[in-house]
Amino acid sequence: SDEETALLTPFEDPKEAAEYLLGTGVRLVAVTLGSEGVLICSRDGSRKVSGFVSHVVDTTGAGDSFWGAFVSQLIRADKSLEEFSIDELEEFARYGNAVASLCVEKRGGLRSIPEESETFERLAVK
């Protein structure tokens, strides 16, 4: 997350931190930015992927739900990290953002994780 970039790198700015990490050999960097979305960086480029508008009830599980959704898309694509274009990574990040935006609209952790059909509905809004 943007709060942790200073712990992992000499930089507080998410973009600078991501570029630093790529320079160390990391192949994919995703810095979550709370309600603002996520910054995705790879050797193919970088993108800030906006979050979705949601009625926030409880932020419990938002980060975990983003990461679960994002990583699930990487796994489903069945490619190595180097093969993903920045456009593909942006779509995976949008999916993760959609899941997280739905998660914060309900109370609790596990019960707030949306069904995939709800996620597709949210993706269609934007």
Identify the meaning behind each predicted range.
Residues 4:
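Active-site rim beta-loop-alpha module in soluble metabolic enzymes
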Residues 1:
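Residue-level signal for inorganic ion chemistry
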Residues 7:
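Small/polar glycine-rich anion-binding or flexible loop at a beta-alpha turn
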Residues 10-126:
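Conserved phosphate-binding/catalytic region of the ribokinase-like
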